[in-house]
């Protein structure tokens, strides 16, 4: 199929090359032989009058022209996929859809395992690829490379639609034997203690509690940085350090780790967990179904109010 002299199939090949950055992987992803992909590259070069790609060792290097074309081509293909092709009725029981979702280790533990259990019952062919927080999640959404982000809403852009899941309360935690946590924790003692904090991605982006503290003008003495919330409670054991984590996570680990949960002396720290999806997925039947599952399971979690009854363990 040609449009103004361009074989539209070549756009699919160009998108695969820009996504995979490998001729072999790109050819495999769109079911082309390597000779057929090499032919497509030659035709793309001829049409656009640009080299587009060159090999440097085993790495595929793209030209500025290829980089400029990539977003428009990706957007066009996604628009076709979700506005024209995906209008078939979605049957969860028969679907083999794989959802790619970016979320934290903590949300996987306290929330998403319930989603997995439910989907296994209602749609046994549906699968998930859960990904750690990325340095540029908005770009992955725009390119349709992930189906959902599950993040604190303060970290979400206004470009794509989102929905609230539930609110989170933050608490201070330390080892059960940490005598500095006995009685009321003063602001001075809190700020003098060594802290454990989570940071994410190659850029070591701050976690939500660190962002909230900085917004309030507080800077802690961080002595240990870990790549996820779930590592914090075990690494507090046997130390005098303290950390701020979501209450749901603290309650989860307090069942198996000698953990003391205390009220922190700072202004009430809380945030909202939300789910975000690409704007082009708004009317995609599979995405709609998955969003309903996420919101329904979030409502079940939010129903029992978090209380301070466990504080001061």
From Swiss-Prot:
DNA-binding region: 23-42
UniProt cross-references to Gene3D superfamilies, sorted A to Z: Periplasmic binding protein-like II, Winged helix-like DNA-binding domain superfamily/Winged helix DNA-binding domain
Keywords attached to this entry: Activator, DNA-binding, Nodulation, Plasmid, Repressor, Transcription, Transcription regulation
Pfam families assigned to the protein according to its UniProt record, in alphabetical order: HTH_1
GO molecular function, one term: DNA binding
Domain of life, per lineage: Bacteria
Domain (HTH lysR-type) ranges: 6-63
Record-linked SUPFAM superfamilies: Periplasmic binding protein-like II, Winged helix' DNA-binding domain
Summary of the function given for this chain in its UniProt record: NodD regulates the expression of the nodABCFE genes which encode other nodulation proteins. NodD is also a negative regulator of its own expression. Binds flavonoids as inducers.
Further comment found in the protein's record: There are at least three nodD genes in R.meliloti. They differ in their specificity of interaction with different flavonoids and, consequently, contribute to the nodulation of various plant host species to different extents.
Family: Belongs to the LysR transcriptional regulatory family.
PANTHER family for the chain: HTH-TYPE TRANSCRIPTIONAL REGULATOR LEUO, HTH-TYPE TRANSCRIPTIONAL REGULATOR LEUO-RELATED
Protein name per its UniProtKB record: Nodulation protein D 3
Species this protein is from: Rhizobium meliloti (strain 1021)
């Amino acid at each position: 199929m040609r449009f103004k002299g361009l074989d539209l199939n070549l756009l699919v090949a160009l998108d695969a090359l820009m996504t995979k950055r490998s001729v072999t992987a790109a050819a495999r992803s769109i079911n082309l032989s390597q000779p057929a992909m090499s032919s497509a590259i030659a035709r793309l070069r001829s049409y656009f009058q640009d080299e587009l790609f060159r090999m440097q060792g085993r790495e595929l290097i793209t030209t500025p022209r290829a980089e400029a074309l990539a977003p428009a081509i990706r957007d066009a293909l996604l628009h076709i996929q979700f506005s024209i092709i995906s209008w078939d009725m979605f049957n969860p029981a028969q679907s083999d859809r794989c959802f790619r979702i970016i979320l934290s280790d903590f949300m996987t533990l306290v929330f998403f395992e319930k989603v997995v259990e439910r989907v296994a019952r209602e749609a046994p062919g549906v699968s998930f690829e859960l990904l750690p927080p990325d340095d540029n999640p908005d770009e992955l959404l725009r390119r349709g490379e992930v189906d959902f982000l599950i993040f604190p809403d303060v970290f979400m852009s206004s470009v794509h639609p989102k929905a609230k899941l539930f609110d989170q309360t933050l608490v201070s935690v330390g080892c059960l034997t940490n005598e500095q946590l006995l009685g009321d924790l003063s602001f001075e003692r809190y700020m003098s203690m060594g802290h454990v904090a989570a940071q994410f991605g190659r850029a070591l982006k701050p976690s939500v509690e660190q962002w909230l503290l900085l917004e309030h003008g507080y800077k802690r003495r961080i002595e240990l940085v870990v790549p996820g919330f779930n590592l914090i409670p075990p690494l507090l054991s046997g130390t005098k350090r303290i950390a701020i984590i979501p209450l749901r996570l603290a309650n989860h680990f307090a069942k198996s780790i000698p953990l003391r949960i205390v009220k922190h002396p700072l202004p009430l720290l809380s945030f909202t967990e939300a789910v975000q999806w690409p704007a082009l997925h708004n009317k995609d039947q599979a995405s709609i179904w998955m969003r309903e599952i996420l919101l329904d399971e979030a409502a079940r979690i939010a129903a029992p109010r978090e209380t301070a009854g466990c504080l001061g363990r």
